[in-house]
Each structure stands twice: as C-alpha cells, then as structure tokens.
Amino acid sequence: MKIPPVSIRYLRSILELKDAPPDQGCEVAFAGRSNAGKSSAINTLANVGGLARVSKTPGRTRMINFFSIDDGRRLVDLPGYGYAKVPGEIHRRWEAALEQYLRYRQSLRGVFLLMDVRHPFTEMDEVMIEWCAHRSIALHVALTKSDKLSRGAAMNARLMAKTRLAGYGSPDFSVQLFSSLKKSGTEEAWEVLGRWLDLPREDQEKTPGA
C-alpha cells in the first residue's frame, strides 16, 4: 500500500481519559519503551517532522497525545514506558489513564508496538503484548532502528519476533522491520494502518502533509 494522501495534525494531549476526544470513529495507538523510537516513527509515517515530540530524555512524553487524520480517524501516541522519572502522583495518574484507555476505548482498532530491534521483548513489551492478547486487540510490532543491524541480522530478528508472537495464538498479531532514519518499512506500516483505519486505497500518489 502506498502512503495515503492524509494530512495528520495534532489534536490534544491528556492525562485523564475523561479529557480524550469523543470515543467515536477509529484509532490506532502507538506504544513502546521510551527509547524505542516511537515519536520518530510517528513523524516518519506522518511525513511531518516534529509532529510527535522527540525528546533526548527518555520518558519525557508523559501524556496521551491524539493526532487527527480526519473527523473519524486518529493516531494516538501513548506514554513511553521504562525510563520515566516523574513524581509519583503524576506517574500513577499516567498509568491509570493508560490502563483505562486500553481497557475502555471503544474506537481503538489496534496497537502499533515499537520495539528496538536490538533489544526487543522487554518485560513491559511482554505486558503490552499479553494485554492485547487477553483483550483480543490487534497488534502490529515494528522492530525499529533496523538500520543498526546488517540485513541478515535484521531478518533473523524479524523471524524470531514472528515466532515469539505466534506463541500468543492471536491471528491479529504481525511484525515488520522499520527504520525512521532510512524511512524503510513505511509502506508496510501503512498497509496495516490503512486496514485498521479503513483508509481509502484509491488516489494514493501524494504523501502525508503534501
């Protein structure tokens, strides 16, 4: 699938689910460890630099960030997990909002999980995968920073990840290689996003933000 002609814009950021946009239409949530390249991946897929904040401090993104494709379709940047050094009360509110979002958000169509290809399947990655399996939420894993490995090593990592995901027994789990630096894997990613968001497939010569 070619990159669809969508224009992605920032919508809002929340700490509590009650402040989220109306639970209508469809959403895809991006999740991952704080240094897995999540924000960079969103910017690459949107073809808009700086759309999602890229911080040099892992865990700086503490809120759930919503981006609008159109009135009925959204991308959601979930807080990165793993390194966040924030006050306890804020951290508790953050975790509660994240859990509530995954549990109750009716418009959620799938989770796009970003994992560093060199350090995949951390403990928190496993928690997210198990949560999706338990809730029957579609999951697509993007092994980021694939440019850091040789092609052979990257393909082996993908095969190992595919085998590991198969162990969860979900037909809606998939995996790919991705590199924001090389912009590789974008069409494969949009194939998944387009299916989940029910994007039209015609007239797809333009790129997002064009």
From Swiss-Prot:
State the Gene Ontology BP annotations: division septum assembly
Name the SUPFAM superfamilies for this protein.
P-loop containing nucleoside triphosphate hydrolases
Stored Pfam families: MMR_HSR1
**Which residues of this UniProt protein bind GTP?**
32-39, 59-63, 77-80, 144-147, 178-180
- Where on this chain does Mg(2+) bind? 39, 61
InterPro entries (alphabetical): G_ENGB_dom (IPR030393), GTP-bd (IPR006073), GTP-bd_ribosome_bio_YsxC (IPR019987), P-loop_NTPase (IPR027417)
PANTHER family linked? ENGB-TYPE G DOMAIN-CONTAINING PROTEIN (PTHR11649:SF13), MSS1/TRME-RELATED GTP-BINDING PROTEIN (PTHR11649)
Family as reported in the entry's similarity comment: Belongs to the TRAFAC class TrmE-Era-EngA-EngB-Septin-like GTPase superfamily. EngB GTPase family.
What HAMAP family does the record point to? Answer: GTPase_EngB
Report the protein name in the record: Probable GTP-binding protein EngB
Organism of derivation:
Methylococcus capsulatus (strain ATCC 33009 / NCIMB 11132 / Bath)
User: What gene is this protein translated from?
Assistant: engB
